[in-house]
Amino acid sequence: MRDALLILATQRMDGEMFLEGRKALVTGSTSGIGLAIARGLAAEGAQVVLNGFGDREEIASLCDELGATHSGADLTDPAAIAAMFDEAGEIDILVNNAGMQHVSPVEDFPPEKWDQLLALNLSAVFHCTRAAVPGMKRKGWGRIVNTASAHSKVASPFKSAYNATKHGVDGFTKTIALELAEHGITANCISPGYVWTPLIEGQIPDTVKARELSREEVINDVRLAKQPTKKFVQPEEVAAMAVFLCRDEAQNVNGANWSVDGGWTAE
């Protein structure tokens, strides 16, 4: 599945790697959606800077695979973000993908978790964008792709911080799209539904136990209840959209929030 979808993500219109000579920084890219996007961009010739945590040997292997470099910057720390950009140099493509989730009734929501989600899911998007834009302006070209969520368009109970941050990412993206449009820079969101990642896969056994349901019931009646296709989105499908948004042919695709959710937000 991954290889087939990656072919779609990197299919060339002109037989050339259209991102040759471009540098891309993808946050939260050592696994899941971010890694799929990094692979898609690297396959089109981009020099990729990975960001995220994980096993050192696995990250080194990914860097070898993609010809990439890696920053382990903690994106909840503005100083660490500034240092990451100082080390990376000017960026042509910024993918703000890093994020986290916490589920709790609002009256029980730990304040420190609220602050942590806002710092990573929203403030880091601002700090990374602020650092990347001057170089993009100097070159007269740039692409900013922000991973939002179906929860940037609709809400779900017990996800107050996540819903708030993803709605914020949507509004921020539209604002900077207007600010930067005359500089050859576009900014767009991608809003996935439930994506089949190791994180989601690992949560299924706990949900089976907590709700006393079968694995199939958890997948179909809980996780996929809102996705009319009854299929998980694959990371490579999100990557395909991100790669397209970096093409010159997408220069007038700006300020949009693209759903990749099996029809969830069409209701």
Task: Describe the residue ranges of each PLM region.
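Short C-terminal tail/terminal secondary-structure segment
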Residues: A4-G15, V154, A242-V243, N254-E267
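Conserved glycine-rich cofactor-binding loop
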Residues: K23, T30-S31
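Substrate-binding pocket helix/loop in short-chain dehydrogenase/reductase
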Residues: P105-V106, P110-L118, I144, R223
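Active-site helix of classical SDR
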Residues: T129, T165, T173
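Residue(s) in the substrate-gating loop at a strand-loop-helix junction
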Residues: S149
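Short, small/polar-rich loop/turn modules that mediate ligand/substrate recognition or access, typified
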Residues: A181, T186, V253-G255
